[in-house]
Amino acid sequence: CSNLSTCVLGKLSQDLHKLQTFPRTNTGAGVP
């Protein structure tokens, strides 16, 4: 990555997208 902040934001957005698209039936899995 050329820009660290861009990298971090990219990873965070990807993680958030995964959480949002994660099946709600598995509530508690990977959730604090």
Swiss-Prot record:
It is found in: Secreted. GO terms for molecular function: hormone activity. One of its GO terms (cellular component) is extracellular region. Disulfide bonds join C1-C7. PROSITE patterns: CALCITONIN (PS00258). It holds the Pfam family Calc_CGRP_IAPP. Belongs to the calcitonin family. This is Calcitonin-2. It comes from Oncorhynchus keta (Chum salmon).
